[in-house]
């Protein structure tokens, strides 16, 4: 059996969880759901699938120390900082080079750092099926999540016919990847029963994904070859990444590879999954009070319903006579937003970024 690795993508900002999520302490370094940072939970989940030394974390320079604190059991060299974000195709290319350096015939998974999965046993079984699939043929393997509703916030994967059954799990051919649809289109997808949410989880062998880069993303492939050569000539990744990585084409792995490839299969997820994309999404993971309020930290609600109140550092946050709000208090910033407007946090952060006096709150 080929050697197996997991590469965890932990470079996002988690903007919709501001003000708890900041540039140096983003969503995946917070205990949004559970008692441990989300990155720590992700590392713990994959420990039963690959050895500790075969787990890499890709992050940013600003988040590097935070990721090291969240992953004390990983070798320091396995936590690698991108000098700047270049989207998921470049991150996949860097992962390819890191794993290839260790074993050019290995299989590796690319996984997000900030998803909530409670059924760890079933998750590990399913991830092993994805590895088995990638090693059974020259395939790009993705894990698809059964839609819970017509969500416009996800890309979708349309399944084709049965490729084969492995360990009791059906592995399906992929007809196509599609970008985030409008509501009517999403409803149509659900009606067919052929579509999965694209959760950004992939498994592939080094030679297979390298061939996909060469065939479908020639410009990026050339940049990765330059990065690989620079790392060899300098004896390490730091100098090579600083010199070459910012020049890599900025594009998602879906656009660069998955939408153009025909050798793709999807393993339908058999475990619970939630990407917890914004503050309102945490409500389902906690027990509300008798009025539907979710309270985290030292918080209270009087004469109000269906609020989410999160308060840090022992500070009492109290709300009275309001409903359907998200209230988040931190030592440096406080957010009050209606649940229906939680997606507008990104627009607020853009205003902060454009204001010299307020940029410090990002």
What are these regions (language model features)?
Residues 11, 60-61, 83, 111-113, ...:
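Fold-independent oxyanion-binding glycine-rich loops
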Residues 28, 41, 45, 66, ...:
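Alpha-helical scaffold segments in soluble metabolic enzymes
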Residues 85-90, 149-151, 183-185, 273-274:
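A short acidic, often aromatic-flanked loop/helix-cap motif at beta-alpha or helix-coil junctions
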Residues 1-8, 15-26, 31-128, 132, ...:
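Conserved N-terminal catalytic core of the sugar/cofactor nucleotidyltransferase
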Residues 2-5, 52-53, 75-76, 103-106, ...:
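Short coil/turn connectors at secondary-structure junctions
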């Amino acid at each position: 059996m080929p050697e197996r690795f997991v590469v965890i993508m932990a470079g996002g900002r988690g903007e919709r969880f501001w003000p708890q999520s900041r540039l140096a302490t983003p969503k995946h370094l917070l205990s949004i759901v559970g008692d441990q940072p989300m990155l720590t939970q992700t590392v713990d989940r994959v420990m039963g699938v690959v050895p500790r030394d075969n787990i890499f974390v890709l992050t940013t320079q600003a988040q590097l120390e935070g990721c090291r604190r969240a992953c004390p059991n990983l070798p320091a060299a396995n936590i690698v900082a991108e000098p700047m974000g270049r989207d998921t195709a470049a991150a996949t290319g860097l992962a390819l080079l890191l794993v290839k350096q260790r074993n050019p015939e290995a299989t590796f998974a690319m996984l997000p750092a900030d998803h909530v999965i409670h059924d760890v046993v079933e998750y590990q079984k399913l991830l092993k099926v994805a590895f088995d699939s990638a090693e059974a043929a020259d395939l790009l393997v993705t894990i698809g999540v059964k839609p819970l509703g017509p969500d416009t916030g996800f890309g979708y994967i349309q399944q084709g016919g049965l490729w084969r059954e492995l360990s009791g799990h059906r592995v399906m051919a992929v007809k196509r990847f599609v970008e985030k649809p409008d509501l009517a289109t999403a409803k149509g997808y659900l009606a067919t029963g052929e579509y999965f949410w694209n959760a950004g989880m992939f498994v592939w062998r080094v030679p297979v994904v390298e061939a996909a880069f060469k065939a479908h993303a020639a410009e990026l492939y050339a940049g990765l070859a330059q990065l690989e050569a620079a790392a060899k000539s300098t004896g390490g990744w730091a100098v090579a990444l600083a010199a070459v990585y910012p020049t890599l084409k900025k594009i998602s792995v879906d656009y660069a590879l998955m939408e153009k490839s025909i050798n793709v299969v999807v393993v339908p997820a058999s475990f619970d999954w939630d990407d917890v994309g914004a503050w309102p999404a945490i409500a389902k993971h906690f027990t509300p009070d008798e009025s539907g309020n979710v309270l985290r930290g030292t918080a209270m609600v009087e004469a109000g319903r269906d609020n989410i109140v999160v308060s840090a550092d022992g500070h009492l946050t109290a709300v009275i006579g309001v409903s359907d709000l998200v209230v988040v208090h931190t030592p440096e910033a406080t957010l009050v937003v209606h649940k229906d407007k939680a997606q507008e946090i990104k627009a607020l952060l853009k205003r902060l970024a454009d204001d010299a006096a307020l940029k410090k709150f990002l």
